[in-house]
């Protein structure tokens, strides 16, 4: 019965430590990917706005 209680979807079960390690790694990877995408979009927008301002003054 111990194998049935240790399901991949249940976190409050007395499973082996190996089952909890992959879960934590997946969460960290997802957060890093989201942060990288947001930073890239912000940098691109700032560069485009600055270029248009110079052309308008000229």
Curated annotation (Swiss-Prot):
Domain of life of the organism encoding this protein: Eukaryota
Ranges where the record places region Disordered: 23-58
Compositionally biased intervals (Low complexity): 23-51
Record protein name field: Putative uncharacterized protein DDB_G0283705
Lineage of the species this protein comes from: Eukaryota, Amoebozoa, Evosea, Eumycetozoa, Dictyostelia
